[in-house]
Amino acid sequence: MESSLCKKSLMKRRRALRVRKVLKGSPTKPRLSVVKTNKHIYVQLIDDSIGKTLASVSTLSKLNKSQGLTKKNQEVAKVLGTQIAELGKNLQLDRVVFDRGPFKYHGIVSMVADGAREGGLQF
């Protein structure tokens, strides 16, 4: 019998793989990946054809630390969404594929998506 912690992490990994098997990022339409931990939020634009991160923002970045955006809440998530949209526009990207990973499209994940849409990204 496996521990509940091992089972929980295994199920989380399976959910992420289930979502990602249908999502592929390309140079013209990268994958917008959202990862949240117990303390922080990470948002990345990823080109899966070459396996490279094109742009990223998080609650750990210097810009957000100087502005006091270090907490993990919905307001900060929306700001991160608008920041990643600005970085995407600097790279001449306007369309992305949204990757929620193993998380429900609810709360922080949906606020990142709303912020990115308000910033001009389409998905």
Swiss-Prot record:
The answer to whether the entry has keyword RNA-binding is: yes
Gene3D superfamilies under this entry?
3.30.420.100
UniProt KW keywords: Ribonucleoprotein, Ribosomal protein, RNA-binding, rRNA-binding
What processes in GO biological process is this protein linked to? translation
Query: Might you report a single GO cellular component term?
Result: cytosolic large ribosomal subunit
* Superkingdom of this protein's organism: Bacteria
Coiled-coil regions listed in the entry: none
Supply the Pfam families for this chain: Ribosomal_L18p
The Swiss-Prot or TrEMBL record annotates one GO molecular function as: 5S rRNA binding
Q: Which family does this protein fall into?
A: Belongs to the universal ribosomal protein uL18 family.
Q: What does this protein do?
A: This is one of the proteins that bind and probably mediate the attachment of the 5S RNA into the large ribosomal subunit, where it forms part of the central protuberance.
**PANTHER family membership:** 39S RIBOSOMAL PROTEIN L18, MITOCHONDRIAL, LARGE RIBOSOMAL SUBUNIT PROTEIN UL18M
The annotated subunit structure for this chain is:
Part of the 50S ribosomal subunit; part of the 5S rRNA/L5/L18/L25 subcomplex. Contacts the 5S and 23S rRNAs.
Q: What HAMAP family does the record tag this protein with?
A: Ribosomal_uL18_B
Q: Please state what the protein is called.
A: Large ribosomal subunit protein uL18
Instruction: Tell me which species this is from.
Output: Chlamydia pneumoniae
Which gene codes for it?
rplR
